């Protein structure tokens, strides 16, 4: 059993669970598109990994968005290789629950993706999101290109100004280059498509993010 302290701060790498050599590869197809869950990113499209609380509801935000080609959920940002859901929820892996978002930048700009991200959760809550508490629920942007990193930091600064104006707190979102991404088990992929009345714990601040207002040209 993990120490409860790792629910409120990320466990040091040397204390994290050892994990396993073999990946827990999903075997089902995407419930919305029918594509393989681990589908490669097509040429010309972009991939980004986003953490905004429980990945069940977070994934739905993106598969419902025009211009998003593919989504999948998994774990990243921590230490333990090939973790399970239970291990991640224990706080002993250091991972966040993430959504892999693959989008067509000719239909949906990066700023529009980030706008959905910022407005879709409360990025000021640290190691929790609403009633969901633990390091796995932290706000995170794991970028796959230098351009994404720059855009994410710029968007964070602009959104912080709006949050300040609304009297809200400081953004705690982790914005870094993406590391390994580990796919979650079958039952978590497109969970709310397979379980329409299932739990969705995410919710935004109500503050509009002043980016991504125009379609790509």
From Swiss-Prot:
Entry's EC annotation: 1.8.4.11
Alphabetical UniProt keywords: Oxidoreductase
The reaction(s) this protein catalyses: L-methionyl-[protein] + [thioredoxin]-disulfide + H2O = L-methionyl-(S)-S-oxide-[protein] + [thioredoxin]-dithiol; [thioredoxin]-disulfide + L-methionine + H2O = L-methionine (S)-S-oxide + [thioredoxin]-dithiol
Matches recorded under Pfam families: PMSR (PF01625)
Active-site residue numbers: 54
InterPro entries given in the database record: Met_Sox_Rdtase_MsrA_dom, Met_Sox_Rdtase_MsrA_sf, MsrA_MetSO_reductase
Gene3D superfamilies: Peptide methionine sulphoxide reductase MsrA
Example GO biological process: protein modification process
Highest taxon listed in the record's lineage: Bacteria
Record's GO cellular component terms: cytoplasm
GO molecular function term, any single one: L-methionine-(S)-S-oxide reductase activity
Functional summary from the UniProt entry: Has an important function as a repair enzyme for proteins that have been inactivated by oxidation. Catalyzes the reversible oxidation-reduction of methionine sulfoxide in proteins to methionine.
Alphabetical list of PANTHER family matching this protein: MITOCHONDRIAL PEPTIDE METHIONINE SULFOXIDE REDUCTASE
Family: Belongs to the MsrA Met sulfoxide reductase family.
Protein name as annotated: Peptide methionine sulfoxide reductase MsrA
Source organism of this protein record: Maricaulis maris (strain MCS10) (Caulobacter maris)
Lineage, highest ranks first: Bacteria, Pseudomonadati, Pseudomonadota, Alphaproteobacteria, Maricaulales
Gene this chain is encoded by: msrA
């Amino acid at each position: 059993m993990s120490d409860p302290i790792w629910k409120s701060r990320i466990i040091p790498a040397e204390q994290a669970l050892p994990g396993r050599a073999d990946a827990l590869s999903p075997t089902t197809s995407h419930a919305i598109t029918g594509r393989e869950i681990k589908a490669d990113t097509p040429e010309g499209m972009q991939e980004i990994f986003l953490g905004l609380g429980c990945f069940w509801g977070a994934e739905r935000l993106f598969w419902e968005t025009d211009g998003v080609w593919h989504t999948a959920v998994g774990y990243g940002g921590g230490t333990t290789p090939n973790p399970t859901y239970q291990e991640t929820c224990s706080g002993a892996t250091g991972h966040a629950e993430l959504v892999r978002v693959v989008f067509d930048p000719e239909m949906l700009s990066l700023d529009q993706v980030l706008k959905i991200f910022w407005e879709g959760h409360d990025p000021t809550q640290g190691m929790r999101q609403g009633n969901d508490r633990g390091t796995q629920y932290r706000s995170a942007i794991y970028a796959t290109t230098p351009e994404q990193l720059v855009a994410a930091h710029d968007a964070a600064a602009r959104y912080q100004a709006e949050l300040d104006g609304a009297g809200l707190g400081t953004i705690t979102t982790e914005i870094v280059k993406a590391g390994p991404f580990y796919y979650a088990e079958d039952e978590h992929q497109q969970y709310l498509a397979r379980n329409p009345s299932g739990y969705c714990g995410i919710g935004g601040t109500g503050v509009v993010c002043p980016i991504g207002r125009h379609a790509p040209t």
